[in-house]
């Protein structure tokens, strides 16, 4: 591993690897629920949850918002350029070690600065990638996924694959080409496409059909290139309805699935579902997970939460136990996430500016999902919801209901049946009772 030059530049000295101490512990630098070696349903917690640290929020975010400049106290920010990139890399793996996470993720521009030309930018990346491979080899930490930042630079003002300018489309293709090469080089288990500016602000100047066709063509090119170079990781689309554009083409899970199926991409892509993006789309986290799951396209998760009182992507660390429990319920029903994981696409609050806050935040999120895993497993084992659902839809298991389910009925048959059975008796959905049961399981764990 590269020689350490950061020992005196941050406040993590003296902090050991975060350990599981149980729910009675008062130590803020200890896990209360997350016990990586604990076996649940035949798998360890570590294997179930597959936690990942997001490079951008953890290493590059400075706390800047629309109303104020950065607040984060990060010693490595005294560097600039490639020196800054190298310093961030070293601290990143120190943090991964303290948290004992198996994975991390990044955008290309998180890990190395953009140069004056594409060639210079790629040279910067190559320098960092060589060092990163050393850290990965020495630590055993793996790359969950990488992606291309095609939303920050002014060239992407009108989008990337959906830009009205062919030169921008070409540049974006070159950037993703390098990204897929990076994924292969680092053995990334997935590669993510998040279309930050793949959408529009007004239809008055937008050829939507052309832009959708171009985006599909771009993704097919990516599939072809991955095959060409032998990259076998899972491609992921990350839905989001808005921000920074007014309307993004991958608005939610259902919209993204329709797009993938329309353009024959659904055999090559799955979805990376983010909790806060579900909130922005007017859905619950578990709704988006369910939609992806029942279509066989749930690939990975960006673990965070939004603030329903605010209209933007707040990317808070996940602490809502209802949300983490219902999320893990869907993930367990999915048979896990395969090559995916729980990536903390989350940032500490602007007022949580000390370096230790990064540890507190990740501990909170990891504990919340560990708790959710335990409760969700018990709910499934006890068939708390499954038996209710089976009973609720029992009329489709016999008689006319079975004929409907098996495709044997038609309007003539159903009209005849309705005329003979004029009395319909519905039953209560018992929503409040089920919520009380959920509370009971949360309190008992």
From Swiss-Prot:
This is Xylose isomerase. Keywords: Carbohydrate metabolism, Cytoplasm, Isomerase, Magnesium, Metal-binding, Xylose metabolism. The lineage of its organism: Bacteria, Bacillati, Bacillota, Bacilli, Bacillales. One of its GO terms (molecular function) is xylose isomerase activity. The gene is xylA. Coiled coil: none annotated. The keyword Cytoplasm applies. Mg(2+) 1 binds at residues 238, 274, 302, 345. Gene3D superfamilies: Divalent-metal-dependent TIM barrel enzymes. Binds 2 magnesium ions per subunit.
